[in-house]
A protein has these predicted regions:
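Alpha-helical oligomerization segments with coiled-coil/rod-like character
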Residues: 1-122
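Intrinsically disordered, low-complexity Ser/Thr-rich linker and spacer segments
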Residues: 94, 126-131
Length: 257
């Protein structure tokens, strides 16, 4: 009877031990399944992230290509405008030189030659912007949002400055000159370009409207456009460049008045 009792106890103990092992194995199986599900979820998340990155890279490259194309169109438009205005610019440069010759001749004779108002205007608008020393007007009063040389996208950098201003504010010519371009350009909106002589020009983009047309003579501080957001930017602002011999240069050293 004692033997039979021990055997029953052993059987019960073994059964309990077996059930415990089965329970542990079941728990382990559940844990493995849960871990597998987590791994699968992590893999799917990683795939989504990689797909998103790939899409973002492609979108960035597409945007970069578009910006390069916009910049190329701007250069080509300016070159065409310069070519169209070349004959007049050369004629005015010769006339301005003739006035300077008169002044020099008078000086040699110990007298002075006083240019007429038209001659003074001619010399001013064909004499270039000179060395940058803060002598030019600010094109608009506002907050500088982007500076020359800052990163625009990828390897592209800002070729000018962006000034945030109230919509409809007057955009003013920074110096005397003649308008050679007033047109819509992709990426820059409504653009006005003023030629100042000697290869210098100023460019005003993102405008709501232009107050001048090609061929208009402008004076320093004269309103030439109204601030807008035609370049596709989120807020009203002015895109402003100075170009010297076709190359964009930092405009800020010229601006002071």
């Amino acid at each position: 009877t004692l033997f039979r009792s021990q055997t029953r106890e052993e059987v019960a103990s073994q059964k309990a031990e077996l059930e415990e092992k089965q329970s542990q194995q079941q728990t382990l199986l559940y844990d493995q399944q849960a871990q597998q599900e987590k791994l699968e979820q992590a893999r799917n998340e990683r795939k989504k992230t990689l797909a998103g990155l790939e899409s973002s890279i492609q979108a960035g490259q597409s945007q970069l290509s578009e910006m390069r194309a916009n910049e190329s169109r701007l250069r080509n438009s300016i070159a065409r405008a310069e070519a169209a205005a070349k004959a007049r610019a050369e004629k005015e440069a010769r006339e301005a030189q003739a006035v300077r010759n008169k002044q020099q001749e008078a000086s040699r004779k110990g007298t002075t030659y006083k240019p007429t108002e038209n001659e003074r205007s001619l010399m001013s608008r064909t004499g270039g912007l000179g060395s940058p020393r803060g002598q030019a007007y600010w094109p608009v009063r506002g907050t500088i949002l982007h500076r020359y040389g800052e990163q625009l996208q990828g390897e592209l950098r800002w070729k000018g400055i962006v000034i945030g201003a109230s919509e409809g504010s007057e955009v003013k010519a920074i110096a005397d000159g003649r308008v050679i371009l007033a047109d819509w350009l992709q990426g820059y909106g409504l653009v006005v370009v003023v030629e100042h002589g000697k290869g210098d020009m100023s460019l005003y983009g993102y405008n709501q409207s232009a107050l001048v047309s090609v061929g208009t003579q402008v004076r320093a501080g004269q309103p030439i456009a109204l601030v807008g957001s035609s370049g596709g930017q989120g807020r009203p602002s002015l895109y402003f460049e100075i170009r010297r011999q076709g190359q964009a240069v930092n405009p800020q050293p010229w601006l002071g008045r």
